[in-house]
Amino acid sequence: MTQPALQIASLHKTYDNGVTALKGVSLDVMPGDFFALLGPNGAGKSTLIGVVSSLVNASSGSVSVFGVDLIANRSDAMRMIGLVPQEINFNMFEKPIDILVNYAGFYGVPRAEALVRAEKQLKAAHLWDKAHMMSRTLSGGMKRRLMIARAMMTEPKLLILDEPTAGVDIEIRRGMWKTLQEVNAAGTTVILTTHYL
C-alpha cells in the first residue's frame, strides 16, 4: 500500500481565546495528488495549513508527511515541505535570482547548486527573463509565481499554498493554476486552500 504524502488523524486546534478552529479533522493526501481545501473564511483552512507547516501547534491529533511524524521528527518532516504563505513576503529590493539563491542557502544548499536550481525554477515559473530585475517591478502575478519558485528551491515533495490566488484578477488566477499544474505534473504533491476553484 502506498504511503500517504500527508496523513492527518483526529486533528484538533483550540486557540487560547477559546475559539475552536479544527474539530477532529482526518484526511489522507496521496503522492502526486493536487488537493484543494475549499471553504469560506473561518472554516479552519489556514489553521490546518499552519499546523501542517509547523507554524501552529495542534491541540491534539497527529500529522505525518510521507510517513514521518511531524511532532516527533519535525525537522525531517519539514525538509519535505515547501510553503507558500498567503502574503508576499520577500524583499522587494532584491532581484528574483538573489531571492531564490539566498532562500536555498538558508536551507543549506551550496551556492553553485542554488544557482542551478534558481535558473530551473525561474524558467519553470516563466520568470527567467526577469531574474535580474528588482522584484518590486514585477506584476502581482509574477510575484505570486516567484513565491512558488522560492518554495520549490528546496525540492520539496509536498508543496503547500495558503490562498495562492487571493485578491488577484482572473487572468493572474489562470496563470497561477497553470504554474501549479506544471509543478504537480513534475511530481510534486500540491495542497492549497482557496475560496473557489
Question: Predicted segments — roles?
Answer:
Residues 159-162:
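Catalytic Walker B motif of ABC-type/P-loop ATPase nucleotide-binding domains
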Residues 148:
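Hydrophobic anchor residue at the start of the ABC signature
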Residues 101, 105, 112-130:
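Conserved ABC ATPase "signature" region
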Residues 53:
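Helix-to-loop junction immediately C-terminal to a conserved catalytic motif
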